[in-house]
């Protein structure tokens, strides 16, 4: 996401290649290949796009030289996509979703750091068999281990973060 000067709002603007290019040192961990599956706001995600994403990820994970798949995703529906992938992926190889709390127009954009952490997770043998994982804010954990926050009086916590579902990144 970057701030569109006309709309004055974040819009999908970064390809997987753009994101990988922002990370120095990735090549010392893995050879990275990018496939831009879509570039839409994450609130456009739903069953038809999840099915297409699952098919692409399963196809990539079937290749013996692929160690894992990283999916760059907006935060609006990140948890729904992660859950979907957790129950539909047919591999014990890591599938790591990354998001960002800051968009690419901000000087402290956290997407590159999250990507580097996801690459490290994909090449770590201990990551096999953990299902869909999330790498964000210098933390990583399997989706099944994510804590459910307790909301006071069961009130929703509203959020105004915009996101996108850009690409999956194969780690070979």
What are these regions (language model features)?
Residues 1-172:
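Active-site histidine-anchored catalytic micro-motif
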